[in-house]
């Protein structure tokens, strides 16, 4: 048979009996083609006989089995290669440790290149970040987490040292976070309500230790991909609800109603219940001096922030103005000068004992181990939120500063960091995008900026705690309110975006997460949001996306018939723009086949046979008979992988077609050897029609031999399969190839007859 290069000028052929040109390669060149060729060591000459792994789809002709003319060169090359490998083994082994060490300890990637200029930039950035992070840490600790102030300060001081060794994002600033502190605060309220003698430091220690352990094992197990599970809409819904909860809780302290709330016989736990409490009791029970002082601080912070935003348009350095630190310093001076606590009854932080912080905490003592069952759910929420928040920050910084960030390494760093700081009784610490961005804008060059922030925090803890004594509690609550408002600022923009884009599923996730958090609890909100997201992922992966193809009239192009017809109708154009081949159904599988979507493939194929489309409702009356289908072409160009369960389903589908005397053709099959080997072992390759291949190719999982001829079960193109169909019609062959039928398919078929 003579070779043909096209089908009516439109397609390539794969059944030429003329052998393609051969070429010679040295042994060194073999590795280049290791993904495309297998070799058989059991040949008669004990050499390496290469076997083509594709039917000319790679565009590389298979090499000649003969070694004439190049045997000596091959042997010499082998000897040279073996000698060089032997000599280089020692040097490679010696350098391996130094090459891989920066991957596991990222500090070794920047320490050798650290200079004085970078040091100066990190010092300035560390001072800038510490100026507002220390007041925030005190605010999170006292007004949100309800634990001693030193828990927050230790979290801010110690965590940067650990992250400086294991962290891989240079500008990342780690420390206590608002949402995390709120989860801890709700856990504290729940535990202390039933166990009055429990130490608040023990609660903080256990939550930090357990969450760190979860993160560490997740990183070791390489679960970093889970950072892609939760959608941005879910996180936005949760963070916005956290912002509202922070405002509600802070308002209680700003009106000095916290003690009155505790004294009531009924309990107000959920944010919605606290809103009802404020409506019922705030008008009559609020403390006037505290409310006035809180209002003044709130107005000052609002005005300074508005001024900063306007100035930043002209002077970017305005972002470094320490408005929060300025308000804290001024209120400390006012509190000291006018004796706010005794003269006006405004509560201050007051004296707090450092006795419980003079030694390291063991998270696994018996009293603390007993707290683990009660605090495990809160610890899991902390680990999840902390990881997602840190991942968001690291990805944003990585995009901005062209960094490659490994989620698994970040998990290990965050996990080990929290295990270490739990020994100090600290709050959980994670990365935050806002402060990390300010750190980068301040001139930070490495993680040493966070270390300097930690040093300044330690200095504050040892020298300036006497001034912390005078900070009014309501001022810290006002700072929390400002942070809560900032968490809500992006919500309107996100809602408008999803409404404009028709993202109603994202809006539903947002609403469910937000409402559940407000009306029930933070844990319930994040759990329901996660469950809904996972269900959506499963639904998405279980849906088959097969396409029915048709040729565009007057061209050699094939297109998705459903989309093409819909587009033609939408644009009021002539819908007679495609050509259907009589008795032939062309189906494209544009995705990997797995156990999740292979079952749906059966149903959609049945719908296509009955209606000519996969988008018509299955309850409608069939538009055509299944007997009209005589040929089915599967375009597997997008099927880059297939698991054994899906291969079994595909084999059953092909077997069912064979019983109806339908001819099956596979085209554009991936050159991936795993895909082809699995199709062969599942019996799929043996059950489909074949194209005549190179006579010199050996019988492998990709070829079959019959009467001296070699055949391949895979066609290069749809046109090649159509050409073969035309040849069969001319010959009058009406019996499809049926060499192989799986035992499982026979068993299932026969069992249905019993």
UniProtKB/Swiss-Prot annotation:
Q: Which GO terms describe its molecular function?
A: secondary active sulfate transmembrane transporter activity; sulfate transmembrane transporter activity
Q: Where is the composition biased (Basic and acidic residues)?
A: 25-45
Compositional bias segments (type: Low complexity):
65-89
Q: Where is this region: Disordered?
A: 1-91
* Annotated GO CC locations: endoplasmic reticulum; endoplasmic reticulum membrane; plasma membrane
> What are the residue boundaries of the STAS domain, all occurrences included?
574-725
Identify its membrane topology class: Multi-pass membrane protein
The record, for InterPro entries, names: S04_transporter_CS, SLC26A/SulP_dom, SLC26A/SulP_fam, STAS_dom, STAS_dom_sf
Q: Which residues cross the membrane?
A: 119-139, 147-167, 173-193, 200-220, 233-253, 283-303, 318-338, 371-391, 411-431, 451-471, 475-495, 518-538
Q: Which residues face the membrane's Cytoplasmic side? A: 1-118, 168-172, 221-232, 304-317, 392-410, 472-474, 539-754
Report the main location listed first in the record.
Answer: endoplasmic reticulum
Residues in the Lumenal compartment per record: 140-146, 194-199, 254-282, 339-370, 432-450, 496-517
> What is the top-level taxon of the source organism?
Eukaryota
Q: Do the record's keywords include Endoplasmic reticulum?
A: yes
Q: Where found in the cell?
A: Endoplasmic reticulum membrane
Q: Which key words are in the record? A: Endoplasmic reticulum, Membrane, Transmembrane, Transmembrane helix, Transport
Protein family: Belongs to the SLC26A/SulP transporter (TC 2.A.53) family.
* Record's function text: Possible sulfate transporter.
The protein depicted here goes by the name Putative sulfate transporter YPR003C
Q: Organism source for this protein?
A: Saccharomyces cerevisiae (strain ATCC 204508 / S288c)
């Amino acid at each position: 048979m003579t070779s043909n290069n096209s089908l009516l000028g439109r397609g390539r052929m794969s059944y030429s009996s003329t052998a393609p040109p051969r070429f010679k390669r040295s042994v060194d060149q073999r590795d280049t083609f290791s993904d495309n060729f297998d070799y058989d060591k059991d040949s008669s000459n004990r050499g390496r006989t290469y076997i083509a792994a594709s039917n000319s789809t790679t565009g590389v002709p298979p090499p000649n089995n003969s070694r004439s003319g190049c045997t000596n060169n091959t042997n010499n090359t082998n000897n040279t290669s073996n000698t060089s490998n032997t000599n280089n083994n020692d040097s490679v082994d010696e350098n391996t440790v130094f090459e891989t060490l920066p991957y596991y300890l990222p500090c070794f990637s920047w320490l050798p290149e650290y200079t004085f200029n970078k040091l100066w930039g990190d010092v300035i950035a560390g001072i800038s970040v510490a100026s507002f992070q220390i007041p925030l840490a005190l605010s999170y600790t006292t007004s949100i987490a309800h634990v001693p102030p030193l828990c927050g300060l230790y979290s801010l001081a110690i965590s940067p040292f650990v992250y400086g060794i294991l962290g891989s994002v240079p500008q990342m600033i780690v420390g206590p976070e608002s949402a995390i502190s709120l989860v801890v605060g709700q856990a504290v309220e729940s535990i202390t309500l039933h166990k009055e003698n429990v130490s608040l430091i023990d609660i903080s220690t256990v939550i930090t230790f357990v969450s760190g352990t979860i993160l560490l094992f997740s990183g070791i197990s390489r679960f970093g991909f889970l950072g892609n599970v939760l959608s941005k809409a879910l996180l936005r819904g949760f963070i916005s609800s956290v912002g509202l909860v922070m405002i509600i809780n802070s308002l209680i302290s700003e009106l000095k109603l916290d003690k009155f709330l505790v004294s009531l016989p009924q309990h107000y736990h959920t944010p919605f219940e606290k809103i009802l409490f404020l409506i019922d009791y705030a008008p009559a029970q609020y403390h006037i001096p505290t409310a006035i002082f809180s209002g003044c601080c709130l107005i000052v912070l609002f005005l300074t922030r508005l001024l900063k935003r306007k100035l930043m348009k002209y002077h970017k350095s305005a972002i470094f103005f320490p408005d929060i630190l300025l308000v804290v310093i001024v209120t400390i001076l006012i509190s000291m000068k006018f004796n706010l606590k005794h003269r006006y009854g405004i509560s201050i932080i007051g004296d707090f004992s450092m006795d419980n912080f003079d030694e390291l905490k063991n998270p696994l003592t018996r009293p603390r181990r007993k707290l683990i069952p009660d605090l495990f759910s809160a610890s899991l929420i902390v680990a999840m939120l902390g990881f997602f928040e840190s991942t968001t920050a690291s990805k944003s910084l990585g995009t901005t500063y062209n960094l490659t960030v490994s989620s698994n390494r970040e998990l290990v760093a965050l996990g080990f960091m929290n295990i270490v700081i739990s020994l100090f009784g600290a709050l959980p610490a994670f990365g935050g995008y806002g402060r990390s961005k300010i750190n980068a804008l301040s001139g930070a060059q490495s993680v040493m900026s966070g270390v300097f922030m930690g040093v300044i925090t330690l200095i504050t803890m040892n020298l300036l705690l006497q001034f912390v004594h005078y900070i009014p509690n309501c001022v810290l609550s006002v700072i929390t309110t400002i942070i809560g408002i900032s968490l809500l600022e992006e919500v309107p923009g996100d809602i408008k975006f999803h409404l404009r884009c028709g993202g109603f599923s994202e809006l539903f996730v947002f609403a469910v997460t937000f409402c559940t958090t407000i009306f029930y609890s933070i844990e319930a909100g994040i759990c329901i949001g996660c469950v809904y997201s996972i269900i959506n992922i499963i639904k998405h992966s279980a849906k088959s996306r097969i396409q029915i193809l048709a040729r565009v009239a007057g061209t050699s192009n094939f297109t998705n018939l459903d989309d093409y017809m819909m587009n033609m109708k939408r644009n009021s154009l002539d819908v007679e723009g495609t050509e259907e081949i009589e008795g032939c159904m062309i189906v494209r599988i544009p995705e990997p086949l797995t156990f999740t979507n292979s079952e749906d493939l059966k149903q959609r194929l049945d719908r296509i046979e009955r209606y000519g489309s996969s988008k018509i409702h299955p309850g409608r009356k069939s538009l055509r008979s299944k007997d009209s289908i005589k040929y089915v072409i599967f375009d597997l160009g997008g099927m880059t992988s297939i698991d054994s369960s899906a291969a079994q389903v595909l084999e059953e589908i092909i077997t069912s077609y064979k019983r109806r005397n339908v001819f099956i053709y596979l085209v554009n099959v991936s050159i991936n050897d795993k895909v082809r080997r699995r199709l062969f072992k599942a019996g799929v390759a043996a059950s489909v029609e074949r194209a005549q291949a190179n006579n010199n190719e050996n019988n492998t999982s990709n070829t079959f031999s019959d009467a001296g001829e070699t055949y391949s079960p895979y066609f290069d193109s749809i046109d090649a399969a159509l050409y073969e169909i035309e040849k069969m019609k001319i010959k009058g062959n009406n019996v499809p190839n049926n060499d192989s039928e799986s035992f499982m398919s026979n068993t299932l078929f026969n069992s249905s007859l019993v």
